[in-house]
Amino acid sequence: SGNQEFKTTKVDSIQLDEYFSNSPYANKINFIKMDIEGAEFKALQGMKSILKKNQNLTILTEFAVTSLEDAGCNPDEFLKLFLDEKFEIFVIDESSMDLVPINKIDISKIKSDNETINLLCKKRT
């Protein structure tokens, strides 16, 4: 890996619930992609209204244990938030591109191997 220099850039952010608060599209959101280096849980907390209002919502997100923990999130709480909001969670198998229900996957192995996986979370209708 060698010596790598990283530059940090501060950017403004806004919660999606706030951004869409007066929008006629707030209940017409059907897809969200998140790859925000461990801040996914914080983003979900800022879109609880969107999660509740949009019955056809699908979210594609990374699940990276170390990144979540570095951001102060318990990975189990991240998954629980999806389940509490009535989402089915699938792991995207990178080799076959199949969707595997999360209950068929050994999450503890993913955690111990420190893997980064992609999840497809689809609202149950």
What is the role of each PLM region?
Residues I14, E62, I92-E94:
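Conserved beta-strand termini and adjacent loop/short-helix elements that scaffold enzyme active sites
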Residues N30-M34, L60-E62, L120-K122:
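Short beta-strand segments
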Residues T9-V11, I59, L119:
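Structural detector for hydrophobic anchor residues on beta-strands
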